[in-house]
């Protein structure tokens, strides 16, 4: 990804991005589903960019997060995640049949995005649910789901193609505003898509080293 904005006015989008919406979740899920659905099934055994998982395992992780966030918004637990576990007692409750291939994974990603979007849209702004990075509202869970889709989607597509794709600018701007309130001032002149990649520890920016530790802030502000 280029270190310089292609459009000198693009940073304005991040300065006044507007709220995160259920349709943003759907748009993000469609972006990733379209990206993974066009690749051969065997390609998903490759490592997903900088993470240690395969592309398939990383996509499953995204699905699992979408399901977990939808369940949090549905159940509104205040002290912990809902007490669910996978068939072997693991934390991950979502597993996609490997024989379903890329097309099946794309369908599940779309379904996970729709499930989270529907739950976010059904709850009032005053609803709250637990997340380890702060008690959050429906918009916060929507933003967290989008970050998982975009950032891990970038990992997956880099693993599948060897090239890290550009992230959607508007979506990146809105989730940065919601989840990363303490960004350095110098990031204000850069495209939000680049800043989101930096904020999640995946690149350097001019004058800013790559982050080795990071977390978002899910609390309501």
Spans of model-derived segments:
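Structured surface interface patches that mediate subunit assembly and partner/cofactor docking
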Residues: 2-24, 31, 38-51, 68-91, ...
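Extended, alpha-helix-rich binding/interface surfaces that flank or overlap catalytic cores
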Residues: 58
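Glycine-rich loop at the start of a catalytic domain that most often binds anionic cofactors/ligands
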Residues: 61-62
């Amino acid at each position: 990804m280029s270190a310089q904005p292609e459009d000198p006015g693009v940073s304005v989008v991040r300065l006044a991005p507007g709220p995160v919406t259920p349709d943003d979740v759907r748009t993000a899920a469609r972006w990733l589903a379209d990206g993974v659905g066009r690749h051969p099934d065997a390609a998903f055994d490759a490592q997903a960019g900088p993470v240690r998982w395969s592309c398939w395992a990383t996509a499953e992780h995204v699905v699992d997060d979408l399901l977990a966030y939808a369940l949090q918004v549905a159940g509104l637990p205040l002290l912990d995640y809902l007490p669910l576990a996978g068939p072997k007692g693991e934390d991950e409750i979502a597993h996609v049949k490997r024989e379903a291939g890329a097309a099946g994974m794309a369908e599940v990603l779309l379904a996970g995005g729709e499930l989270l979007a529907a739950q976010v849209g059904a709850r009032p702004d005053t609803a709250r649910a637990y997340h380890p990075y702060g008690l959050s509202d429906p918009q916060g869970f929507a933003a967290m789901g989008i970050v998982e889709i975009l950032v891990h989607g970038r990992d997956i597509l880099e693993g599948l193609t060897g090239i890290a794709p550009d992230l959607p600018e508007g979506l990146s701007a809105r989730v940065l505003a919601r989840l990363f309130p303490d960004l350095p001032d110098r990031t204000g002149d850069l495209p939000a898509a680049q800043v989101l990649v930096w904020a999640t520890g995946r690149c350097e920016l001019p004058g800013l080293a790559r982050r080795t530790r990071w977390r978002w802030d899910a609390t309501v502000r």
